[in-house]
Amino acid sequence: MNLTTMGQAAKAAAFDLAVAPTAQKNKALAIIADELEANKDAILAANEKDIKAAVEAGISEAMQDRLLLTEERLVGIANDVRNVINLNDPVGSEIDSKVLENGMSLSRRRVPIGVIGVIYEARPNVTIDIASLCLKTGNASILRGGKETFFSNMELVKVIQVALEKAGLPAASVQYIEKPDRELVSQLLTMDDYVDMIIPRGGAGLHKMCKENSSIPVIIGGFGISHAFVDESADLERALVVVDNSKAQRPSACNALDTLLVHEAVAPQFLALLANNMAGRVELVAEPKAYGLLKEFEGVSLREAQEGDFDTEWLSYTLGVKVVADVNEAAAHMQKHNASHSDTILTNNIESAEKFINTAGSAAVYVNASTRFTDGAQFGLGAEVAVSTQKLHARGPMGLEELTSYKWVGKADYLIRS
């Protein structure tokens, strides 16, 4: 496999995509959706190979479920592509404009970024999500999925490329790195002549490697410790429902709750509710004050927090628990422990809510709502290519607009600078 050749082909395809009309891009998306359903037998057969390999490798059942494609899930993925068709195409839209004193009409117009390299985890639906969003925004993409979904991804990319050609667009608009070789990832990160942006979707190790080795701008997405703070004024029964949803609805999601902070004034009452609610379902990892309150309850899976626990993105049925003095201590804890993804305060006090909003450094901050809402579809953005936890270019769920840049357009009547 020659990555340089892939890069050259992607750059050439990006020029064609940048001027492709919305109707043509939507036609390609419609064909992709239809081809996914028409080729379901081949796709599911490829997925069976991945699942068999996962079982033989001893991969957890939770991870196997993330790898699994079913006919129902495939229909859902096809419909997600159709939903992208219905989203407004941001390319070519005017962000703002003004007329200068010299008579020039000056505006900013949205344009594609160019070629986007995406390195992502073992979820085959991500292949379709990324390809669809990049296509809609006129970006070419080079994808590198996890080895656990190799066969599934190869079949999915084949379907995408057939659809692109049927729509009159270059097949190289979406390419896939076939070998799960880390050396190829390292090479991709240095291909700044061809690739304009890198998006890693995975754990802290992948993000660190990309930041340290890439000569291409990197969007850091997904990783971050998510917190909930239960304030002394909170409605405890309703707060418990939000905490449960944040933690247990889908614990493997990047927006699932990792650490629960509880105001000391309500800690005895709330932790009693928490213990009964989480018993038999969630392991609680508690600092001394919280541990002392929780150990009184039977049936609770409980251990004392060790160094590094509050810096851990659990992605499982595990929850860190800490008692704090007030919203200020909660904010200080969050600043120390990588609160960059999604954080929520449960409170009936407006001042506490505003202080939390202003001090939280996360990409998404909530008042009396679950952390699980940090998602492109939930935000009304359609699908997402990633959830950015950095501060430059894009922040939070990255939908269509976040996959564009802009150019300045000046129009005048043969104007010269004096």
Swiss-Prot record:
It is found in: Cytoplasm. Keywords: Amino-acid biosynthesis, Cytoplasm, NADP, Oxidoreductase, Proline biosynthesis. Signal peptide: none annotated. It comes from the Bacteria. It catalyses: L-glutamate 5-semialdehyde + phosphate + NADP(+) = L-glutamyl 5-phosphate + NADPH + H(+). GO terms for molecular function: glutamate-5-semialdehyde dehydrogenase activity; NADP binding. Gene3D superfamilies: Aldehyde Dehydrogenase, Chain A, domain 1 (3.40.605.10), Aldehyde Dehydrogenase, Chain A, domain 2 (3.40.309.10). PROSITE patterns: PROA. InterPro entries: Ald_DH/histidinol_DH, Ald_DH_C, Ald_DH_N, Aldehyde_DH_dom, G-glutamylP_reductase_CS, Glu-5-SA_DH, GPR_dom. Its EC number is 1.2.1.41. Disulfide bonds: none annotated. Coiled coil: none annotated. GO terms for biological process: L-proline biosynthetic process. Catalyzes the NADPH-dependent reduction of L-glutamate 5-phosphate into L-glutamate 5-semialdehyde and phosphate. The product spontaneously undergoes cyclization to form 1-pyrroline-5-carboxylate. PANTHER family: DELTA-1-PYRROLINE-5-CARBOXYLATE SYNTHASE, GLUTAMATE SEMIALDEHYDE DEHYDROGENASE. Belongs to the gamma-glutamyl phosphate reductase family. NCBIfam families: PRK00197.1, proA. HAMAP family: ProA. This is Gamma-glutamyl phosphate reductase. The gene is proA.
